[in-house]
């Protein structure tokens, strides 16, 4: 079997050990004569899978007991609506940071429900970093403070948790489980699974119990109410059972790797060596302020963009897949989530060096 190094931004690479487990269990899960994909979501087999996945995630992230962990459908984009629907309550204002493509989309959705107040706008820096926090325009009162921890398209990542007394809401879709952080600083965190936690179709929400007491907007459908999902333990209807199962396997994999802190060190090494190569090169360029460079999504351009197609063609021929940049920005993007090995990053750097020698 020959597998390539997959640098896709999402759906993204899944650890091989996890894929082997899925293969071995697919037809007969734990001797029951059925696949876990075939069992009832309310049967004891899947209930056990679901409860174990939640316990493991709570342990990995040190999630306090005062938080519910929800396993939802709809992707992260649905959270752009669910957050204001559930958290605005009597407020007319919510604070947002525009740090790139995904935060901008969230801001657009929020305008359907409130007056989004921009604390700062990275557009002023051409989305190459975040303006200094001392310059942010912060109101004294608002329903919540929303930001995207890692912008997958723009290649920007927050190296700190914003300092605010407002309820923090964070989109961690592309870097949850990639580094330790203090969950208790947040009111709500959400992340789609297809970056670091498996399959598209599952979104994880970690929400403080106090926020579940807020009254949703009157027009909020019952299915979009966090409190109801919490009450029903994410079983209002049939959840994405196979994606939930796979996420649970990945949580086990993270534990077997030594936990989130061990992965954080590995992720830092992977990103550092790739950025170091790009910075030394006269052929490749990354425009992001080093302080805000993403460890998960490394964007770069070729000095001669007429060579883009050739670069991608030769990369694919060398077992390096899905390096094409997002359609809005162009260029290249290497997504190096938890499942990407250091050997994969080394192979990419070696190929880039050889390509530069031939065409630089």
Curated annotation (Swiss-Prot):
On the tree of life, the source organism's domain of life is: Bacteria
Pathway the protein acts in: Amino-acid biosynthesis; L-serine biosynthesis; L-serine from 3-phospho-D-glycerate: step 2/3; Cofactor biosynthesis; pyridoxine 5'-phosphate biosynthesis; pyridoxine 5'-phosphate from D-erythrose 4-phosphate: step 3/5
Tell me which residues bind pyridoxal 5'-phosphate. Answer: 102, 152, 171, 194, 237-238
Catalytic reactions of this protein: O-phospho-L-serine + 2-oxoglutarate = 3-phosphooxypyruvate + L-glutamate; 4-(phosphooxy)-L-threonine + 2-oxoglutarate = (R)-3-hydroxy-2-oxo-4-phosphooxybutanoate + L-glutamate
* Residues that coordinate or bind L-glutamate: 42
**EC code(s) of this entry:** 2.6.1.52
HAMAP family with a match to the protein in the record: SerC_aminotrans_5 (MF_00160)
Q: Does the keyword Heme apply?
A: no
Query: How is the quaternary structure described?
Result: Homodimer.
Cellular localisation: Cytoplasm
Q: Which gene encodes it?
A: serC
Its main localization is cytoplasm
Which cofactor does this sequence's record say it needs?
pyridoxal 5'-phosphate
Q: What is this protein called?
A: Phosphoserine aminotransferase
Q: Keywords, A to Z?
A: Amino-acid biosynthesis, Aminotransferase, Cytoplasm, Pyridoxal phosphate, Pyridoxine biosynthesis, Serine biosynthesis, Transferase
Q: How is the cofactor bound?
A: Binds 1 pyridoxal phosphate per subunit.
Q: Which residues carry this modification: N6-(pyridoxal phosphate)lysine?
A: 195
């Amino acid at each position: 079997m020959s597998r390539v190094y997959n640098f896709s931004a999402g759906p993204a690479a899944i650890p091989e050990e996890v894929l082997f487990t899925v293969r071995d269990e697919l037809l007969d899960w734990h001797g029951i004569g059925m696949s876990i994909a075939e069992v009832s979501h309310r049967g004891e087999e899947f209930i056990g899978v679901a409860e174990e996945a939640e316990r493991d995630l709570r342990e990995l992230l040190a999630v306090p007991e005062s938080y519910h962990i929800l396993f939802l459908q709809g992707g992260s984009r649905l959270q752009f609506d669910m957050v204001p629907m559930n958290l605005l309550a009597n407020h007319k204002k919510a604070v947002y940071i525009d740090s790139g493509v995904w935060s901008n989309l969230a801001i657009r959705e929020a305008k359907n429900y409130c007056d989004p107040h921009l604390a700062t706008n990275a557009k002023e820096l051409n989305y190459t970093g975040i303006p200094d926090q001392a310059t942010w325009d912060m109101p004294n009162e608002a329903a919540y403070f929303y930001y995207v921890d890692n912008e997958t398209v723009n290649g920007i990542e927050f190296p700190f948790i914003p300092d605010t007394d407002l309820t923090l809401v964070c989109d961690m879709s592309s870097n949850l489980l990639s580094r330790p952080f203090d969950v208790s600083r947040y009111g709500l965190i959400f992340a789609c699974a297809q970056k670091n936690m498996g399959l598209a179709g599952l979104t994880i929400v970690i929400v403080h119990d106090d926020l579940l007491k807020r009254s949703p907007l009157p027009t909020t459908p019952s299915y979009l109410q966090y409190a109801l999902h919490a009450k029903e333990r994410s079983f209002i209807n049939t959840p994405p059972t196979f994606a939930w199962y796979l996420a649970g396997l990945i949580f086990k994999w993270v534990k077997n790797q030594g936990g989130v802190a061990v992965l954080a060190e590995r992720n830092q090494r992977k990103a550092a060596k790739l950025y170091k190569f790009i910075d030394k090169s006269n052929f490749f360029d990354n425009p992001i302020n080093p302080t805000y460079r993403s460890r998960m999504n490394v964007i770069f351009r070729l000095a001669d963009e007429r060579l883009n197609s050739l670069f991608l063609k030769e990369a694919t021929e060398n077992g390096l897949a899905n390096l094409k940049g997002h359609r809005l920005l162009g260029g290249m993007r290497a997504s190096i989530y938890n499942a990407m090995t250091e050997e994969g990053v080394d192979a990419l750097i070696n190929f880039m060096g050889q390509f530069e020698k031939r065409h630089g």
